Amino acid sequence: MYQNLNSKTSPSSETSHKISLVIGPTEVADVMTGKVVTLSPHHSFNDAANLMNDRYFRHCVVVDNQSKVVGVISDRDILRALARNPNSRSKSLDQIMTPNPITVKRRTPIIDAVSKILAKRINCLPVVEDDGSVCGIVTSTDLLKSYQQVLELVQKQGR
C-alpha cells in the first residue's frame, strides 16, 4: 500500500552545527522529517485517506517509480474532492493530488522555506536531493517548532 523511504542524511558542517546551537536550526535539514511515507500516483483515494488517518498525517508525498516527487496529497485535497464529488473514493491520486509541488533541498535556509510556504499559502514542502528524489518533508508545524526553539533560546539568554 505504501513505502517507507529511509532518511538520506548528510552530516552538517561544523560551522552550521555551532550556529544552530546558538541561534537554533538554520537549514531545512535541521527541521525536516527525514523518513517519508510515500504513495504512487496510482494509489487510490481510499489508500491515501486510510494511511493519513491511521498515521495522523496531514500530507503525503506522491512519487514516481524513481522516487521523484510528482505531487502532494493533503487532508484538504481529500476533503475538497469529497465535497465536489461524493464518488471521489474511486479516483486515483493522480486525479486529486496537487501536481508538481514546490520543493526545497535539505541545505535550503529555513527562512527561504518559510517564505515559500507563506507566499504560496501552502503547508508543506517536499525535500528533494539534487536528482529530484524525495529525502524528506518540511511542514509549517516543523517550522513553527524551530521558531519556538529559537524563541526559547533567546528567552533563556535574556535571563
Q: Residue locations for each model-derived region?
A:
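Tandem CBS (Cystathionine beta-synthase) repeat/Bateman regulatory domains
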Residues: 1-159
